[in-house]
């Protein structure tokens, strides 16, 4: 869990900025969204395959240029 302690003389805005950066670096938001609802194994597989197709199409387009 991301934790930020206020340093002496530090403004709350700076501490909040450090906290947000730490949360992004640790991918906490992504994990929370991933665990917010249950996906059946078949649905997980379909999502994974769709992402793989999307990546391969993107890679093919990039190679054409």
Curated annotation (Swiss-Prot):
Residues 53-65 have a biased composition (Basic residues). Residues 43-52 have a biased composition (Basic and acidic residues). GO terms for biological process: translation. It comes from the Bacteria. Keywords: Ribonucleoprotein, Ribosomal protein. Pfam families: Ribosomal_S21. One of its GO terms (cellular component) is ribonucleoprotein complex. Residues 43-65 are annotated as: Disordered. GO terms for molecular function: structural constituent of ribosome. Signal peptide: none annotated. Belongs to the bacterial ribosomal protein bS21 family. HAMAP family: Ribosomal_bS21. This is Small ribosomal subunit protein bS21. It comes from Koribacter versatilis (strain Ellin345). The gene is rpsU.
